[in-house]
Design a protein with these regions (language model features):
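Positively charged n-region of N-terminal signal peptides that target proteins for export
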Residues: 1-4
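Bacterial N-terminal signal peptides
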Residues: 7-15
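Sequence context of c-type cytochrome heme-c attachment sites
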Residues: 19-128, 132, 138-163, 182-212
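A contiguous, mid-protein "functional segment" used to position or interact
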Residues: 162-184
Length: 212
């Protein structure tokens, strides 16, 4: 989804090769609050935003998890001295920034623990830096938007929506990442996969920003 929120990595189009090191705020994700809304996956967003979903699927953010698999993103791995044959999908420090909702309710389950059957089925749906990586877990605000065509941003925030700002991007795109390249957020946000057009809704299930 090339939206105003496209994924956690929105501040930097990364070739997706290597382990982006999560900041303290990202690592805190493995300790969710009891009332924290669940992640529902980008396919849920697709129901109303199918054009944006199709656009997002073509981005490197969508393929971020694939880049962690053996013999992927070889040029970048070579550049930063990462083992080209290693499976980085088993490294929590890498996975946290290459999936959606790592360790959070409804998100990608934690690496290194035994997964339940439900988590095994859920994990593939949360691979890659998806819509909710930048927009927040959609369990509550997604249905609210469908039922309330006139809504305010503040209402969505109370339901778990997140503004895709520089701080959000830098939770993963920071100097703890072996592939990090300094960037100007203001310049980057308007280019390529980080472009922030208004969302367009493809049928009568919703309207952009409460508009008609």
């Amino acid at each position: 989804m090339r939206w105003l929120l496209i994924t956690t990595g929105m501040a930097l189009t990364f070739s997706g090769a290597a382990a982006l090191r999560p900041s303290a705020s990202t690592e805190a994700a493995v300790c969710p609050r009891a009332d924290e809304p669940k992640y529902v996956g980008s396919k849920t967003c697709q129901k109303c935003h199918f054009k944006e979903y199709g656009s997002w699927q073509k981005t490197k953010m969508a393929q971020a998890f694939t880049s962690l698999k053996p013999n992927q993103a070889l040029e970048v791995r070579k550049k930063v001295n990462l083992d080209p044959a290693k499976d980085y999908t088993k490294e929590a420090a890498c996975v946290a920034c290459h999936v959606t909702g790592y360790g959070k309710p409804g998100g990608y389950p934690e690496v290194g623990k035994e997964w339940t059957e439900e988590e095994k089925l859920r994990a593939p749906l949360m691979e890659g830096v998806g819509c909710e990586s930048c927009h927040g877990p959609g369990e509550k605000y997604s249905p609210y938007k469908k039922d309330n065509k006139e809504y305010k941003w503040a209402e969505l925030v109370k339901l778990g929506a997140v503004h895709a700002d520089e701080k959000n991007c830098k939770s993963c795109h920071n100097d703890k990442s072996p592939t990090f390249v300094p960037f100007n957020f203001t310049e980057k946000i308007g280019k390529d996969t980080h472009e922030v057009p208004k969302l367009k809704f493809n049928h009568d299930c919703d309207h952009p920003h409460g508009g008609k």
